[in-house]
C-alpha cells in the first residue's frame, strides 16, 4: 500500500474533531467486521457494487490494485496507519478464481453514464451549444431595442452634461412645434422674392452677392528665374521660396484691406494709422450685429 493511501485514511478518521486514533480505529474495525459476514460470499466487488470501503464510507482510495504482498511487507511500526487495510486486503482476495480489480477500474465502471445517470459527452456538448445559441439570440434581440436608449448611459458624466446642454440650446425641430415655418410651395412665396433663379432671391440689383471664395494659386514661371542662378538647383529653390512668400504677403495685405473697407471703422486721428487689433475688433462687432439682426428677424417671423 502506498504512503499516500495512509494519509488519506488519516483524513477519513477526521482527527480535527478531537477523536483519538484508538477509538476511531476500533470504530472502523468493528464496521468492517460487521459488513464482512454479510458480503463475504457475494460477488460485491463488481461494476454494480463498489468495494466495501467506498460503499460504506463514501471515499475512494488512490490505489490501482491491492495485492496480498503489499500487506505482508508492511513494517510493524506502520501498523497503526495501515492496520485497517489488512482486513480489506483479505476481503478483496476472498475469491481466488476472480481476478483482482483495482479501485480506479471499479470507479470507472461505477461512474459510467449508463449506471449513474450522468450525461455523455455528446449530450453535454449538444446542451451547451443549444444554450449558447439561445443566449446569443437573446442578446441580439435586446441590443436592437437598447441602442436608442443606451447612448446617454455610455457617455461619461461630463460628455452627457455637454450633450444635454447642447440639446437645450439647439432643440430639435418637430413637425408640431410652434416655430414658424417657411412656405414650401413656390406659389405661396411673394412675387418680390421670386426670380428666375428660384425663390428667396430679391429682385433689386443692389443686394449683396459675394463672389465664391477661392485662394489664388501662386506660380512662378521658369522664365522669371535669374540667369546667374538657373544652373544651380539649390539657389533656384531658395529664390522661388522667397518670391512665393513675397507674393503671399502681398495677397494677404490686399485681402485684409478689402475686408476693412466693408466694415465700419473709426476715423483716423491726426492722420495716424489705426492698429490692426482695433480693426479686427470692428470686424467682430459687425459679425455680432449681423447675428443680432438675424435673431430680430426670426422673432418677427415667429410673431407673424
From Swiss-Prot:
Q: Which domain of life is it from?
A: Eukaryota
Q: Which GO terms describe its molecular function?
A: DNA binding; protein dimerization activity
Enumerate the SUPFAM superfamilies for this protein: HLH, helix-loop-helix DNA-binding domain (SSF47459)
Tell me if RNA-binding is a UniProt keyword of this record: no
Show the Pfam families listed in the entry. Answer: bHLH_INO2
Mention any one GO cellular component term assigned to this protein in its UniProt record. Answer: nucleus
Assigned keywords, A-Z: Activator, DNA-binding, Lipid biosynthesis, Lipid metabolism, Nucleus, Phospholipid biosynthesis, Phospholipid metabolism, Transcription, Transcription regulation
Q: Does the keyword Transcription apply?
A: yes
Tell me where in or outside the cell this protein is found. Answer: Nucleus
Q: Name one GO biological process term.
A: positive regulation of transcription by RNA polymerase II
Q: Where is the bHLH domain?
A: 236-290
InterPro entries membership: bHLH_dom, HLH_DNA-bd_sf
PROSITE patterns xref list? BHLH
Could you describe the subunit structure of this protein? Answer: Efficient DNA binding requires dimerization with another bHLH protein.
Tell me more from the record: Present with 784 molecules/cell in log phase SD medium.
* Role played: Positive regulatory factor required for depression of the coregulated phospholipid biosynthetic enzymes. Also involved in the expression of ITR1.
The protein, known as: Protein INO2
- Species annotation: Saccharomyces cerevisiae (strain ATCC 204508 / S288c)
Traced from the root, the source organism's taxonomic lineage reads: Eukaryota, Fungi, Dikarya, Ascomycota, Saccharomycotina
Amino acid at each position: 500500500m502506498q504512503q499516500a493511501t495512509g494519509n488519506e485514511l488519516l483524513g477519513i478518521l477526521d482527527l480535527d474533531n478531537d477523536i483519538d486514533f484508538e477509538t476511531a480505529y476500533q470504530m472502523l474495525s468493528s464496521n468492517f467486521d460487521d459488513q464482512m459476514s454479510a458480503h463475504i460470499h457475494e460477488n460485491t466487488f463488481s461494476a454494480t457494487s463498489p468495494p466495501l470501503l467506498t460503499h460504506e464510507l463514501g471515499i475512494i482510495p488512490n490505489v490501482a490494485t491491492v495485492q496480498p504482498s503489499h500487506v505482508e511487507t508492511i513494517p510493524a511500526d506502520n501498523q497503526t496507519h495501515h492496520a485497517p487495510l489488512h482486513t480489506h486486503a483479505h476481503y478483496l482476495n476472498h475469491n481466488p478464481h476472480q481476478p483482482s480489480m483495482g479501485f480506479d477500474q471499479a470507479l470507472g465502471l461505477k461512474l459510467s453514464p449508463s449506471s449513474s445517470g450522468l450525461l455523455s459527452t455528446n449530450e453535454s456538448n449538444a446542451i451547451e451549444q443549444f444554450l449558447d445559441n439561445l443566449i446569443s439570440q437573446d442578446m441580439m434581440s435586446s441590443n436592437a431595442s437598447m441602442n436608442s436608449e443606451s447612448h446617454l448611459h455610455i457617455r461619461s458624466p461630463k460628455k452627457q452634461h455637454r450633450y444635454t446642454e447642447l440639446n437645450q440650446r439647439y432643440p430639435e425641430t418637430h413637425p408640431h412645434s410652434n416655430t414658424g415655418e417657411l412656405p414650401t410651395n413656390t406659389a405661396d412665396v411673394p412675387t418680390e422674392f421670386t426670380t428666375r433663379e428660384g425663390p428667396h432671391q430679391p429682385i433689386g440689383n443692389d443686394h449683396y452677392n459675394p463672389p465664391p471664395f477661392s485662394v489664388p494659386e501662386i506660380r512662378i514661371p521658369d522664365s522669371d528665374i535669374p540667369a546667374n542662378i538657373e544652373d544651380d538647383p539649390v539657389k533656384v529653390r531658395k529664390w522661388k521660396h522667397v518670391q512665393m512668400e513675397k507674393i503671399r504677403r502681398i495677397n494677404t495685405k490686399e485681402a485684409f484691406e478689402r475686408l476693412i473697407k466693408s466694415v465700419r471703422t473709426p476715423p483716423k486721428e491726426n492722420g495716424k494709422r489705426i492698429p490692426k487689433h482695433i480693426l479686427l475688433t470692428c470686424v467682430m462687432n459687425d459679425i455680432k450685429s449681423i447675428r443680432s439682426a438675424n435673431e430680430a428677424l426670426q422673432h418677427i417671423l415667429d410673431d407673424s
